[in-house]
């Protein structure tokens, strides 16, 4: 890091600099310099490598294809959409799971992109079948908290996991906004609210992976890195996709939780 009279600079991972010049009142003005072509090249490599993976209709595929969906939306490269569409159509033709789980609902994220980009009804139908499952059939406990499920069996009775925020709550929120469904939005925010209450340590600000409502404990009690990533990412997205988010009381809990978590991660 180097300092000067008007700014300081930080080298980024792509070899450019982060500059923070002073504003008119002497305050810092954020400015990020980066090599767009280099970043797009990295995105391109990741997309192509991901599409060469043998993934099935479950959460790893859902997370990976959410990334490809986002790459398409951010870059506008139709090639990414075509790759995604071809693979999803292939998986649909091979046959979808007979029973949905919370984990399998992660595939709903790429279905949103495909439906919005193509208008093809089959993507909307499958997406809404996942939402119907989450609303009516998914196991819940306490104040309608989703139990994390990985199969048709009741593998983890009355357990909530951070994973559910990405696989289900974030999906419900996105679909609720897309469909102008306030009941679904409220349900999604309720999931955020209770996962915060159950999984975030109020003393440290960090998140546990899971909570067992029957035993009344956090099982291993560790601050799992990926669990904190599920929480941080999904909470960071709420304000950007929920219109007039400040009108929803539970959003205040989401924003506060995220701030506390990021402050904790900064010094952890």
Roles of regions detected by a PLM:
Residues 2, 6-268:
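Glycan-recognition and catalytic cores of secretory/periplasmic carbohydrate-active enzymes
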